[in-house]
Regions:
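A composition-driven surface/loop motif
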Residues: 1-196
Length: 196
């Protein structure tokens, strides 16, 4: 297909995989005007509770939506996850030109890998995993955001600036940071061992 609009919709598989290969855009936004009988906002959801989600498309718009599976893999030019959730019971991998995760959550129970050619905007967002977290980006804006590994290492690399003003960078084991410049004003960093 070219485009897929799943606004306030549900795409799922109880025991299998979900694969979406689009030449256009994936819209998984939550339309705040869509409410259930109790008045709760219906979240657009793409889920494979016991399987894997593979999404390969031009743009992913998951504003306020949920993408969840045992393993979640996204490959796109632009990923917009503002106030959305991208997660997995095991691993999450995202490969994109840009990722906007403002007020959003990207979380893996095991390992998380985010590769962004241009900018990762994680203002007031969370990019985290229980296992190892690997982030490679052209630049990282983590103002008031959180980038961390609960039980393993955080490997954060940027070809440009990492802005961590009022942000949180943490790892249970190693915290590895490589960048052209690091703005670390008013921050919290926790680790067993830090290498900057």
């Amino acid at each position: 297909a070219h485009n897929l609009d799943n606004t306030a919709g549900q795409i799922g598989s109880s025991n299998g995989n979900v694969g979406l290969n689009l030449s256009g855009d994936l819209n998984n936004n939550t339309d705040v005007s869509v409410k259930d009988a109790a008045g709760k906002t219906i979240k657009s959801t793409i889920a494979a509770a016991n399987g894997q989600i593979d999404i390969n498309t031009r743009n992913v718009s998951n504003q306020g939506g949920v993408i969840y599976a045992q393993n979640t893999h996204l490959e796109a030019q632009d990923v917009n996850n503002q106030s959305g959730e991208i997660s997995a019971a095991n691993n999450v991998s995202i490969s994109a030109s840009s990722v906007d995760n403002r007020l959003g959550t990207v979380f893996a129970q095991d390992e998380l890998t985010v590769t962004v050619q241009n900018g990762l905007n994680n203002q007031s967002g969370t990019v985290a995993a229980k296992g190892k977290v690997t982030v490679q980006a052209g630049s990282v804006d983590n103002q008031t955001g959180s980038l961390y590994s609960q039980k393993n290492a955080l490997d954060l690399k940027s070809q440009g600036v990492i802005n961590n003003t009022d942000g949180y960078l943490a790892a249970d084991t190693d915290l590895l940071i490589a960048a052209k410049a690091l703005d670390n004003n008013r921050t919290n960093q926790n680790t067993q061992q830090a290498i900057v």
